[in-house]
Amino acid sequence: MRGLLLAGLVALPASVLAHPSPAGHGIQRRAVDLNAFRLKTSATYADATETANDPALSFTSLEKQSYVDTATQFVKAIAPGLTFRVVDDHYVGDNEIAHVNFRQTANGLDIDNADFNVNVGKDGKIFSHGNSFFKGKIPDASSLTKRDFSDPTVALKGTMETLKLSLGIEKASIKPTDGEKESYVFNGVSGTVSDPKAKLVYFAKPDGTLALTWRVETDVDHDWLLTYVDAQSGKEVHGVVNYVAEADYKVYPWGLNDPTEGSRVMIKDPWDTVASEFTWNSDGTKKYPTTRGNNGIAQSNPSGEDDYINNHRPRSSNLSFNYPYSPSSSPPSSYIDASIVQLFYTANMYHDLLYTLGFTEKTGNFEFNNNGQGGRGNDYVILNSQDGSGTNNANFATPPDGQPGRMRMYTWTKSQPYRDGSFEAGIVIHEYTHGVSNRLTGGPANSNCLSTIEAGGMGEGWGDFMATAIRLKAADTRAKDYTMGAWAANDPKGIREYPYSTSLTTNPLAYSNVDGDDSVHSIGTVWATMLYELMWNLIDKHGKNVSAKPTMKGGVPTDGKYLAMKLVVDGMALQPCNPNFVQARDAILDADKALTKGANRCEIWKAFAKRGLGYGAKYNENKRVTSNKLPSGC
């Protein structure tokens, strides 16, 4: 689960087929550790420097050739003899770098964890690229022509047995998906939010072979899973991807992290009309007198169920959302309207800021009506306040572009009275950032690209970093330390092992700490610590802007804080599917090269080198090579 914390494992009945759940669906607690099934895909990343200096990688588009054609020819040259398809999510970012994603195929089927991303500069030359294409032997197609593989229903049962999913399938039926090869939908299954799906694909195994698998998709609230079930046995699970990562508004204004930092105020028309052209209370076709609009729909969800449309939302015919709240109030349900408004405000403010930083419709952002700006619509964020499916946590589900994101904010029971996570902006921002990193890494159509332990850890780290950067105050210096989740958890130390700090005494974390660590949250703390160093190096050079939005000059933030955030966002779009620390670092360096011609190269290198990810650092799954060295010129 990509949530704020790692949830404990609660056992479910072992015989899921003998005891199906009742009609409808209930909240399912995870009965197995999904980390055991994480993908182990290895990608390569040729950064901008390597690409420019290697004649074998130099490739320039022909006159009048599109960037998609250029990228396609490049992949053909790099991977001769392999078959692949262009993923329909290519775009040109606001830094003028074009991003094109490819999926390898075999015998007419996708190899679901074999991807190639090509970044093309505005000069028509290849800027950088990432590659996780399968290089082994392609199986003979005879098993497909003879249909020598299991039925998708067998794969669904195998998923249920292996992952202990309590689904009711006694009334299930199956039908093929129109226009798709070996793709099916299960109707009449209880225990899921939406109908399960199965699609026949290949899966590249760590031993260098390809397995024919059924990719079984099951959304069971807390876990929205893609399970790769061996199509021969119908039982062996080769890997699992989880999409879930645990007017007038009276609110705590943007920049205040929680109730300890200030007071609520009335804010009038806070939206950015470029990012939210319909305002926050309209989707361009209809105006809503409630907490619903183009970017999100916020409501209470005490049952923890999925039928959000009919749930309670505060209503105001004159769009004046002013409701009482005090941190000393109890129970939390007594201030649910204030909670919903706060969550709606924070999520929309972040949407508008991210738009300025480059997370727009064409890059896969979350909007119901994309208004002809590219990408796929119908995917605002479902914002559940005081969600009854859990406590002391939060999570965000990120399906591919065109399907709504889903944020669940919980009540925290670590204090008396209990505290509502929606009033800690850092938690909301952390969760929303899962949606950003999943949509940008590998392209908007692929939400599987932060599925390895290290990539998933960086997913947690990006969330912590963005939340921390946003809460900076005018008087802060690089000596300022920040914790994560301290107010909600009622613990001044927060919910991470160390506070975010540039002091090696206060926070000694370095690249070597990732060795042997299988917790995405502790890995993420290492990554966010490095980004915190990066931010302060850039602030020392460019100054600090604590306004709600950056001042841009030629598409570049003029201050160090927002420049760091911009480079992080741009780096996500450049890096390969399932990156490691070294590749993500190189993507940030490339982002600066594209945005500023490398003006901040040394500041970036110094930040990473301080924490062991310097020049010469190398990724190895079991023993990472650390380095505090700087490249020449720094």
Curated annotation (Swiss-Prot):
GO BP terms, alphabetized: proteolysis
Glycosylated residues in this chain: 318, 545
Predominant location category: secreted
CDD domains: M36
Class in the EC hierarchy, top level: hydrolase
Annotated EC: 3.4.24.-
Keywords: Glycoprotein, Hydrolase, Metal-binding, Metalloprotease, Protease, Secreted, Signal, Zinc, Zymogen
Catalytic residues (UniProt): 431
SS bonds (residue pairs): none
Chain spans, region Disordered: 282-313
Highest taxon of the lineage: Eukaryota
Localization (cell): Secreted
Cofactor binding: number and manner: Binds 1 zinc ion per subunit.
Biased composition (Polar residues): 291-303
InterPro entries for the chain: FTP_domain, Fungal_virulence_M36, Peptidase_M36, Peptidase_M4/M1_CTD_sf
Name under which the protein is recorded: Extracellular metalloproteinase mep
Organism of origin: Aspergillus clavatus (strain ATCC 1007 / CBS 513.65 / DSM 816 / NCTC 3887 / NRRL 1 / QM 1276 / 107)
Gene: mep
